[in-house]
């Protein structure tokens, strides 16, 4: 089964939020698994029965096609590959916005806090090569069309670095600046250096795919455990217990 429980939030995902004729729904790969899982659930309520049906839930079908950046239509969805060209910005509400370049076209991207992948988005830097997927939101009076992201796949990370004062190996200390354009000098042994050194910084994100927490999944969002699975087909068996009345 999949998407039955969000362990990060300790939240049950089997049951509807509002009053509903459906008491719970188990998502799984085949009818045998669903029947077995259903027997493990022991509700206090008296249920009328169950029905097993096939759907496109958890298939990622809406993100199988590549978006045409020259025909960036609202309410369409798909994937894009591009390079980050604008440093991510974080709003007061915790949402993250950044831009990528795809075939010389700038695409604005949004990652919303409920997805729980904002921590990934805000760590992106200019030069990161990504594959992203989501739906295009229509333009408003205050915002242009934007791609609302449902996943971020980091294909190649750009190296992150900063300039630091030169390090004196003799004294095991960083040198001090002698003044603007005057270089650096060790205060102990007086060794000098003309330039700062570049220090590379370990990135907190990795070259992998990031998807929202389970509780933030949309109907079609493909869970991690299904990412590498090939499409399965189970033919209907009229003798199986696909429909049962208690």
Question: How would you name each of these model-derived features?
Answer:
Residues 1-246:
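OB-fold and OB-like single-stranded nucleic-acid-recognition modules
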């Amino acid at each position: 089964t999949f998407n039955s429980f969000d362990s990060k939030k300790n939240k049950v995902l089997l049951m509807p939020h509002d009053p509903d004729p459906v008491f719970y729904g188990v998502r799984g790969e085949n009818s045998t698994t669903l029947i077995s899982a259903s027997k493990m659930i022991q509700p206090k309520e008296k249920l009328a029965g169950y029905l097993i049906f096939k759907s496109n839930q958890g298939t990622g079908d809406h993100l199988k096609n590549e978006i045409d950046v020259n025909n960036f239509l609202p309410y369409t969805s798909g994937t894009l590959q591009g390079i980050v060209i604008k440093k991510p910005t974080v709003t007061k509400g915790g949402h993250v916005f950044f831009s990528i370049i795809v075939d010389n076209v700038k695409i604005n991207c949004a990652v919303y806090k409920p997805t729980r992948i904002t921590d990934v988005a805000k760590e992106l830097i200019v030069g990161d090569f990504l594959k992203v997927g989501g739906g295009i939101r229509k333009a408003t009076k205050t915002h242009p069309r934007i791609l609302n992201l449902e996943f971020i796949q980091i294909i190649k990370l750009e190296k992150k670095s900063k300039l630091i004062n030169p390090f004196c190996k003799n004294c095991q200390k960083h040198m001090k600046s002698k003044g603007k354009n005057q270089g650096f000098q060790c205060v102990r042994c007086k060794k000098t250096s003309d330039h700062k050194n570049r220090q590379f910084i370990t990135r907190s994100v990795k070259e992998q795919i990031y998807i929202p927490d389970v509780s933030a999944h949309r109907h079609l969002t493909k869970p991690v455990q299904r990412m590498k699975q090939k499409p399965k087909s189970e033919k209907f068996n009229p003798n199986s217990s696909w429909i049962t009345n208690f």
